[in-house]
Structure formats: structure tokens, C-alpha cells
Curated annotation (Swiss-Prot):
Organism: Treponema pallidum (strain Nichols)
Molecular function terms from GO: lipid-linked peptidoglycan transporter activity; peptidoglycan glycosyltransferase activity
Keywords from the UniProt entry: Cell inner membrane, Cell membrane, Cell shape, Cell wall biogenesis/degradation, Glycosyltransferase, Membrane, Peptidoglycan synthesis, Transferase, Transmembrane, Transmembrane helix
Lineage: Bacteria, Pseudomonadati, Spirochaetota, Spirochaetia, Spirochaetales
EC number: 2.4.99.28
Protein name: Peptidoglycan glycosyltransferase RodA
Pathway field: Cell wall biogenesis; peptidoglycan biosynthesis
Role according to the record: Peptidoglycan polymerase that is essential for cell wall elongation.
Gene, per the UniProt record: rodA
Amino acid sequence: MRIRGVSDFDYLLLLTMLALTSIGILFIYSSGVNSEGHVISREYLKQIVWAVMGVVLMLSVSMYDYHRFKDRTTLIFAGFILLLIYTRLFGRYVNGAKSWIGVGEFGIQISEFAKIAYILYLAHYLVYSQSEPMLKRFAKAGVITLLPMALILSQPDLGTASVYLPIFLVMCFIAGFPLRLIFAVVCVVLLTLLFTLLPLWEQTFLQYQGVATRIADSRMLSLFVFFSLSATSAVAVVGYLLSGRKYYYWITYALGMVSISYGASLLGVRVLKPYQMMRLIIFLNPEVDPLKAGWHIIQSMIAIGSGGAFGMGYLRGPQSHYRFLPQQSTDFIFSILSEEWGFVGGVIVFGLYLLFFLHTLSIMSHVDDLYGKLIASGVLGMFLFHFVVNVGMTMGIMPITGIPLLLLSYGGSSLWTAMIATGLLMSINARQL
């Protein structure tokens, strides 16, 4: 495998990453300035230190042949699973989630770095399992995905756990799985959320107990619905096996998704905390709880709207400096940027991310081996999901899940994860035939 020279180093990816990180540091600093112009937070200094260390990590990974991860991915992935278990048992709580380990003020979020281990291991499995039956291979890939997701969800950290799903879907698409399988997973996830949240939606927005609420409140009714759906699905399976008719297949396909989704929702209402479920629906109308669950979205939309075309000027945003906006250096950093730099600033950030995404697609199109292509697709899925959900959350069109905007939001673990992932892209791009 040929490594190209310094003249062919991926400067475009490096400069894009540095531009986004620099913008992030600017607005982390802005978030730490109060209404009197005094700096009350030193988060920006920590972010600068983490950024410098992250660049070193990124360049180190870029110089390492990504093929050499193949024989080590099982050990790396197993190590992170053990670390996630350790975090669940002995970690410390930060923002309501037991997701950090460390000593004193120094701590790391293992679930962030586990994304990289997961991408490497899933890519390795999908490459070396191509001779296995399709459904068996897809099911095993699903189990590999559910393992870290379940451990992270138990912390409970819904936002970080949810990132693994789009990574899985994008990598399975690149691996060549039929669209019907990928579509089925998407439908099951959406239906599970629907069945889980529908009773709360009735109570919060309609303010009465409808059919969904009455079924959810009765364990007997819930089990009856589940077993009825499962039995009907089983009958459809038997009909398809005996007759071979196509419509039995599609009935089984549809009813199977509904049955699995409803069964998963029965577990979901016991796993998700009440505040997590409220966050998932409050974006539909934050005014129903403007001082609690809806406060973040309302203040974020005010900040973005007040920025106008050119913004109110750097360090001149009242929403952030008067501390109206919670989590403004992390989850809602895009709101500060839009308030102070306006629509133009938002377009600049959008353009930089678009450049990152298109360049990653270009790398994928030129990679000769499936392993490298799968790793790049996993990185793309991770970055794209973070971007869409975080920006959509600040605009009030996506639920609040606590997902940071990679490279911009404050936080060493997420920043290092993003930079290590960028280093993997550089390593792949530098070793094309």
C-alpha cells in the first residue's frame, strides 16, 4: 500500500477541521462572558489545550496504516465494552448521566471514544463475514450495535446511544445489504418511538387520556395487544411458508415490524426516564411547558431569530451573555453563533460541514478496499447525525437529546473523538493505490 508524499497530504480536511474548531473556541469564549463583559468561565482555555492535543492525536492516527487495526479491532472493541461496564458501575454523574470516569477534575466520557472502536470493529466484521448468509450477518451486526447502545442507554445517555444507529445503517448500506432490511430498522425505530411517546403526547398536548394512554396504563391490555400482533404475524409467516404467495410476505414484513416495535416500546417506557421522553416530544410545541422542558428550545429560537442576517456582533448576544440560554457552550453553541454572526455565520458553518461531508464522500469513492470504505462511511454517519440533530435541535425542529456539535461544542472527549475520526479519514486517503 503506497503512502503518498507531503505534497499530497490532505490539507483540505485539515484546514476544514481547524476552521470549525477555531470557530468553536471563539464561541466557547463568548459563552463565558457575562452581561458586564467579564469572563466568568475558563472553558475556552481548556478547549484550546484539548484542541492542540487533539491535533497531535489526529496527525498520529493519520500516519498509522489503518489496515493494521484489522487484527486489533476485537481486542479494542472488547476493551471499550469492559470500560463501558466499569463506567456504569463505578463512573461519576455529570448532567444526570453516569458516563464519566477519571480522577479529580480530569475525566473522560468513554461512550464518545467507544464510537471509534465500534466503527473499526463493525467494519472488520462486515468485511470478514461476507460469506455468511445475509440475514445472519445482518442480525450479528445488529447485536454488535445493540451491545454498546444498551450499556450507554443504561447510564442513562440517550443522545450518545442514539448515534450508534445511523452509523450502523450507513455502514450496512455501504456493505451492500438490501434496502428493505435497512428500511425495516428505520421503521422499527420510528414506530417504537411512536408507541412509547404516544401516551405522553396525548396527556401533554391533547390533555386527556385517549386510547393509547388507557392501553399503556393497563399491563393486561398492553400484553394483549402485543401477543395479538405477534400471533397475527405468526399466522402470516405460516401462510407464506405454505402457499409461497407474495402478499403473505409483505403482510409478515409489515406486521413483524409493528410487533417488534410495540414489544420494544413496552421496554422503552421502563428504560427511558420521564424527562427524556418529555424532551423527545416537547419540540412539537415548547409553549406547553415554557419554563421547564420547553425553555431550552424557546430561548434557542429567540437567539437564532434575533441574529437576523448579519448578527448582533461578536460578544454582543444578550441571550448568551444574560445567561438565558442553558448549555450554551455545548449543546446550544450554534444558537450563540447564529445570534452573534447571524444567517451569514450559520451559512459559513454549514458550508464548512458540507465541505467536510463532500470530501469524505470523495474519499469513499476512491477507496479500493471495503474495509477503508466502511470506516469512512461510519465516520460520515457519525458526523452527519451529530450535525443534523444538533442544528435541528437549536432550531426547534428536532428533539433535545444532548448531542454536541462536533468540533464546535465544548468538551474534550467529543473533540478528541472527532479529531481521531478525522485522522482515520486522512489515513485512508493517504493509502489509496
